[in-house]
Amino acid sequence: MATLRVDEIHKILRERIEQYNRKVGIENIGRVVQVGDGIARIIGLGEIMSGELVQFAEGTRGIALNLESKNVGIVLMGDGLMIQEGSFVKATGRIAQIPVSEAYLGRVVNALAKPIDGKGEIIASESRLIESPAPSIISRRSVYEPLQTGLIAIDSMIPIGRGQRELIIGDRQTGKTAVATDTILNQKGQGVICVYVAIGQRASSVAQVVTTFHEEGAMEYTIVVAEMADSPATLQYLAPYTGAALAEYFMYRERHTLIIYDDLSKQAQAYRQMSLLLRRPPGREAYPGDVFYLHSRLLERAAKLNSLLGEGSMTALPIVETQSGDVSAYIPTNVISITDGQIFLSADLFNAGIRPAINVGISVSRVGSAAQIKAMKQVAGKSKLELAQFAELQAFAQFASALDKTSQNQLARGRRLRELLKQSQANPLPVEEQIATIYTGTRGYLDSLEIEQVNKFLDELRKHLKDTKPQFQEIISSSKTFTEQAEILLKEAIQEQLERFSLQ
């Protein structure tokens, strides 16, 4: 019988001791006492931060929102159907963050930045906090560069600048999403990264928007963040912050970004649902007391950065839905007070066939002409005043039996100006063509035409100008001013087109 020598035993023991590698760690673990309706109550999580991520035993994640003396209120980032009472929950020690990279361009993702378009995983080496602080006062500079939407009514009278927050507000089915998507389509070739955030919408509506982006070649520079109507309230609440984090990634890399939140009414409703289930005290319209902060901390992240930070920008176009045109409701007034102006879409104008249905009278941009090129200021300076006078005169004309010649001419001019503001969807115009269109209307060249002929004439004029007077576009795009030479070229093109049109 073989016997082990002392040195062999010593060697075996040494090897075993060297292989022994026991890690000692402390984990913050709690237990589920109640779960349901997307909310879980946990006991035992003593040291946990507000907003910290937690991991349930069956894989679902959640965010700690209510820190109470006896328990912690967790909102679930999933349906949580498999979570059982008494199961364990582990605090991760991390605040919610998402991966970010250039690879997100052209993709459709959810509120956790996971792809939902079936095109495979997205490779990202960096990450950003979903809720990061807004740039400080010193980090910003005033808005001075225009962000062209391609819509004549906006670019001429309610201009938007890079780094601005402009609210799009109106009833349902008034074309709010169409204004936002047309703005994205118009950024093609402008070096602007676009993020479209769909919150609580029908999957068919989001699919339609994505299809439009693909058809028009806009997905190359666009990221779509989508949480549908059947998504948990937590994810609908997080989606705008995820979109903002993706846009910020590009902004801090000296790029220009545009973000659309479609729409913040749905986010507020999701937050109200979460807050009521967490037993937070309800306020006006049953919204919690911090619903203003919900939107202000999101929209304050839009900024124009100063030269030390690279002059990047993030322009936000939040959308808010009103009920029967009531802009004095809680959420609309909150967002109006946070933003730098609003574009009001009217159901009456939409039903009258004026599309985009922008009510120019009560729409405003608080940045104003600082966000316009000089050529647009020169040509469109008085158009808002003329349209306001036309609206006033039109209301008066309903009661007056006879109008003098001057008033009749003013009414005729106003009707043609309103007609030239009409644009079909997915047909944004470059700023040079907008300037030509507005000049034609404000200088009275359309007065001799029937109203039904105005848009046909303008379409043909823009084509004629592009084909025969390419120098016009070159002058405007290079000098940004409406020079005498540009005016001569435009007048020639208008006269030629009027002669051709009269022969038809």
UniProtKB/Swiss-Prot annotation:
<dbReference type="InterPro" id="IPR005294">
    <property type="entry name" value="ATP_synth_F1_asu"/>
</dbReference>
<dbReference type="InterPro" id="IPR027417">
    <property type="entry name" value="P-loop_NTPase"/>
</dbReference>
<comment type="function">
    <text>Produces ATP from ADP in the presence of a proton gradient across the membrane. The alpha chain is a regulatory subunit.</text>
</comment>
<dbReference type="GO" id="GO:0005524">
    <property type="term" value="F:ATP binding"/>
</dbReference>
<keyword id="KW-0813">Transport</keyword>
<keyword id="KW-0793">Thylakoid</keyword>
<dbReference type="GO" id="GO:0009535">
    <property type="term" value="C:chloroplast thylakoid membrane"/>
</dbReference>
<keyword id="KW-0150">Chloroplast</keyword>
<comment type="similarity">
    <text>Belongs to the ATPase alpha/beta chains family.</text>
</comment>
<protein>
    <recommendedName>
        <fullName>ATP synthase subunit alpha, chloroplastic</fullName>
        <ecNumber>7.1.2.2</ecNumber>
    </recommendedName>
</protein>
<keyword id="KW-0067">ATP-binding</keyword>
<keyword id="KW-0472">Membrane</keyword>
<dbReference type="GO" id="GO:0043531">
    <property type="term" value="F:ADP binding"/>
</dbReference>
<dbReference type="InterPro" id="IPR038376">
    <property type="entry name" value="ATP_synth_asu_C_sf"/>
</dbReference>
<dbReference type="Pfam" id="PF02874">
    <property type="entry name" value="ATP-synt_ab_N"/>
</dbReference>
<keyword id="KW-0406">Ion transport</keyword>
<dbReference type="GO" id="GO:0045259">
    <property type="term" value="C:proton-transporting ATP synthase complex"/>
</dbReference>
<dbReference type="InterPro" id="IPR023366">
    <property type="entry name" value="ATP_synth_asu-like_sf"/>
</dbReference>
<feature type="binding site">
    <location>
        <begin position="170"/>
        <end position="177"/>
    </location>
    <ligand>
        <name>ATP</name>
    </ligand>
</feature>
<dbReference type="Pfam" id="PF00306">
    <property type="entry name" value="ATP-synt_ab_C"/>
</dbReference>
<dbReference type="InterPro" id="IPR036121">
    <property type="entry name" value="ATPase_F1/V1/A1_a/bsu_N_sf"/>
</dbReference>
<dbReference type="InterPro" id="IPR000194">
    <property type="entry name" value="ATPase_F1/V1/A1_a/bsu_nucl-bd"/>
</dbReference>
<dbReference type="InterPro" id="IPR033732">
    <property type="entry name" value="ATP_synth_F1_a_nt-bd_dom"/>
</dbReference>
<keyword id="KW-1278">Translocase</keyword>
<dbReference type="GO" id="GO:0046933">
    <property type="term" value="F:proton-transporting ATP synthase activity, rotational mechanism"/>
</dbReference>
<keyword id="KW-0375">Hydrogen ion transport</keyword>
<dbReference type="InterPro" id="IPR000793">
    <property type="entry name" value="ATP_synth_asu_C"/>
</dbReference>
<dbReference type="Pfam" id="PF00006">
    <property type="entry name" value="ATP-synt_ab"/>
</dbReference>
<comment type="subunit">
    <text>F-type ATPases have 2 components, CF(1) - the catalytic core - and CF(0) - the membrane proton channel. CF(1) has five subunits: alpha(3), beta(3), gamma(1), delta(1), epsilon(1). CF(0) has four main subunits: a, b, b' and c.</text>
</comment>
<feature type="site" description="Required for activity">
    <location>
        <position position="363"/>
    </location>
</feature>
<keyword id="KW-0934">Plastid</keyword>
<keyword id="KW-0139">CF(1)</keyword>
<dbReference type="InterPro" id="IPR020003">
    <property type="entry name" value="ATPase_a/bsu_AS"/>
</dbReference>
<keyword id="KW-0547">Nucleotide-binding</keyword>
<keyword id="KW-0066">ATP synthesis</keyword>
<dbReference type="InterPro" id="IPR004100">
    <property type="entry name" value="ATPase_F1/V1/A1_a/bsu_N"/>
</dbReference>
